[in-house]
Amino acid sequence: MANVVVVGAQWGDEGKGKITDLLSEKAHVVVRYQGGVNAGHTVVVGGQIFKLHLIPSGILYPDKRCIIASGTVIDPEVLLAEIDQLHQLGISTHNLYIAETAHVTLPYHRVIDVAEEERRGIYRLGTTGRGIGPTYADKAERMGIRVVDLMYPDQLRERLSWAIPYKNVLLEKIYNLPPLDPEPIIEQYLAYAERLRPYVTDAALLLTQAIEERQNILFEGAQGTLLDLDYGTYPYVTSSHPIAGGACVGAGIGPTSIDRVIGVAKAYTTRVGEGPFPTELKDEIGAYLGAAGAEFGTTTGRQRRCGWFDGVIGRYAVRINGLDCLAITKLDVLDGLDEIKVCVAYEYQGREIRHFPSDARVFAQCKPIYETLPGWKCSTKDCRSLEDLPPEAYDYLKFLAQLMQVPIAIVSLGASRDQTIIVEDPIHGPKRALLYPNGRKQVHALMPD
């Protein structure tokens, strides 16, 4: 195989869970490298639905080691509930490992997250309210609680006995909320610690050993490129780094250890929460996409905003992540449409721009410039090869590959594993340098000309 990073090429919810699940079959180790319970993956196997927030999708394979790495933030209550749910479904978690250096979400993080969002009023960010941002803020301020702290009761009690009164000052003085009682929280997290103890390890060392043994490692990102703290639609972003470079810091590996980067994008675009969205559809087509695609968040249940495919942010994701290939998901949601539009550029103050603007104020004023392609009336759900696709669907994929200037390796046509077209092996297929030996020579049906 190789060491492969799977990233979202849009605003998250692209279907990374299914793609990671498919690729996990060839991996020895699957790593979740950033984010927390603000992300959710849905995997369907044999008609059984698995909804995961923290545990890597590879857990469904008993012979794969699954690591929750240092770049994540862990809510013990949610993590233990996931473990219990998997056990109830007959899935073992003997192959789960938790980085001792990952930071821990505490009750005051969740309270502050919700209170701060309410305080922002019309300037709210649309957070999940799960305490992710405040947990990462404590990490940056060097006052966070790490998983390793849970392993030492006296140390945990000492740290929380200082941290909770400090947070109570914020709750009372800034948010006008009642203080939290330290003792129940301390006892609760001591109990969590005992249940988590068998899973806790030096994850970075474990990965180093796997790399030295030339094992195949799959790095699974949460959220998407446009939610990256540095390179997303700031301030409407998450508090971590979902981009491919985030795998190095979050997992504790060097950049030379990464062999390939696979981007996942829907055949249209969705976004949850606040922030600019140039191709958003607020008409009956947007409602159709939302209904046909079951566009409700795994974590919050919030309805996702829907729009046409945005090639501008797509090209940006290719550049920022150095994508080698793409997996296009939910192509079947477009079944039945008379025509399909794709954003190829933006209009801003009377001029055309083809790059993603880093200034949110500029981005908010961008209007999409579309190219219109014919739709198709038949279902694609049962297609298992490119030849099975209606010509219009094939041409649509070809157009996206040309627009993004990166090959499409996987096409997903439903939630189940078997509802997939493997166009080219995304792991063992040719690298970017081999795809374009003479400029942009076409070497595959779904590679750009």
Curated annotation (Swiss-Prot):
<dbReference type="InterPro" id="IPR042109">
    <property type="entry name" value="Adenylosuccinate_synth_dom1"/>
</dbReference>
<feature type="binding site">
    <location>
        <position position="304"/>
    </location>
    <ligand>
        <name>GTP</name>
    </ligand>
</feature>
<feature type="binding site">
    <location>
        <position position="142"/>
    </location>
    <ligand>
        <name>IMP</name>
    </ligand>
</feature>
<dbReference type="InterPro" id="IPR018220">
    <property type="entry name" value="Adenylosuccin_syn_GTP-bd"/>
</dbReference>
<feature type="binding site">
    <location>
        <position position="40"/>
    </location>
    <ligand>
        <name>Mg(2+)</name>
    </ligand>
</feature>
<dbReference type="GO" id="GO:0000287">
    <property type="term" value="F:magnesium ion binding"/>
</dbReference>
<feature type="active site" description="Proton donor">
    <location>
        <position position="41"/>
    </location>
</feature>
<dbReference type="InterPro" id="IPR042110">
    <property type="entry name" value="Adenylosuccinate_synth_dom2"/>
</dbReference>
<dbReference type="InterPro" id="IPR042111">
    <property type="entry name" value="Adenylosuccinate_synth_dom3"/>
</dbReference>
<dbReference type="Pfam" id="PF00709">
    <property type="entry name" value="Adenylsucc_synt"/>
</dbReference>
<keyword id="KW-0342">GTP-binding</keyword>
<dbReference type="InterPro" id="IPR033128">
    <property type="entry name" value="Adenylosuccin_syn_Lys_AS"/>
</dbReference>
<feature type="active site" description="Proton acceptor">
    <location>
        <position position="13"/>
    </location>
</feature>
<keyword id="KW-0460">Magnesium</keyword>
<feature type="binding site">
    <location>
        <begin position="40"/>
        <end position="42"/>
    </location>
    <ligand>
        <name>GTP</name>
    </ligand>
</feature>
<dbReference type="InterPro" id="IPR027417">
    <property type="entry name" value="P-loop_NTPase"/>
</dbReference>
<feature type="binding site">
    <location>
        <begin position="12"/>
        <end position="18"/>
    </location>
    <ligand>
        <name>GTP</name>
    </ligand>
</feature>
<feature type="binding site" description="in other chain">
    <location>
        <begin position="13"/>
        <end position="16"/>
    </location>
    <ligand>
        <name>IMP</name>
    </ligand>
</feature>
<feature type="binding site">
    <location>
        <begin position="412"/>
        <end position="414"/>
    </location>
    <ligand>
        <name>GTP</name>
    </ligand>
</feature>
<comment type="pathway">
    <text>Purine metabolism; AMP biosynthesis via de novo pathway; AMP from IMP: step 1/2.</text>
</comment>
<dbReference type="GO" id="GO:0005525">
    <property type="term" value="F:GTP binding"/>
</dbReference>
<comment type="subunit">
    <text>Homodimer.</text>
</comment>
<comment type="similarity">
    <text>Belongs to the adenylosuccinate synthetase family.</text>
</comment>
<dbReference type="InterPro" id="IPR001114">
    <property type="entry name" value="Adenylosuccinate_synthetase"/>
</dbReference>
<feature type="binding site">
    <location>
        <begin position="330"/>
        <end position="332"/>
    </location>
    <ligand>
        <name>GTP</name>
    </ligand>
</feature>
<keyword id="KW-0658">Purine biosynthesis</keyword>
<feature type="binding site">
    <location>
        <begin position="298"/>
        <end position="304"/>
    </location>
    <ligand>
        <name>substrate</name>
    </ligand>
</feature>
<feature type="binding site">
    <location>
        <position position="13"/>
    </location>
    <ligand>
        <name>Mg(2+)</name>
    </ligand>
</feature>
<keyword id="KW-0479">Metal-binding</keyword>
<feature type="binding site" description="in other chain">
    <location>
        <position position="238"/>
    </location>
    <ligand>
        <name>IMP</name>
    </ligand>
</feature>
<keyword id="KW-0547">Nucleotide-binding</keyword>
<dbReference type="GO" id="GO:0044208">
    <property type="term" value="P:'de novo' AMP biosynthetic process"/>
</dbReference>
<keyword id="KW-0963">Cytoplasm</keyword>
<dbReference type="GO" id="GO:0005737">
    <property type="term" value="C:cytoplasm"/>
</dbReference>
<dbReference type="GO" id="GO:0046040">
    <property type="term" value="P:IMP metabolic process"/>
</dbReference>
<comment type="function">
    <text>Plays an important role in the de novo pathway of purine nucleotide biosynthesis. Catalyzes the first committed step in the biosynthesis of AMP from IMP.</text>
</comment>
<dbReference type="GO" id="GO:0004019">
    <property type="term" value="F:adenylosuccinate synthase activity"/>
</dbReference>
<keyword id="KW-0436">Ligase</keyword>
<protein>
    <recommendedName>
        <fullName>Adenylosuccinate synthetase</fullName>
        <ecNumber>6.3.4.4</ecNumber>
    </recommendedName>
</protein>
<feature type="binding site" description="in other chain">
    <location>
        <position position="128"/>
    </location>
    <ligand>
        <name>IMP</name>
    </ligand>
</feature>
<feature type="binding site" description="in other chain">
    <location>
        <position position="302"/>
    </location>
    <ligand>
        <name>IMP</name>
    </ligand>
</feature>
<feature type="binding site" description="in other chain">
    <location>
        <position position="223"/>
    </location>
    <ligand>
        <name>IMP</name>
    </ligand>
</feature>
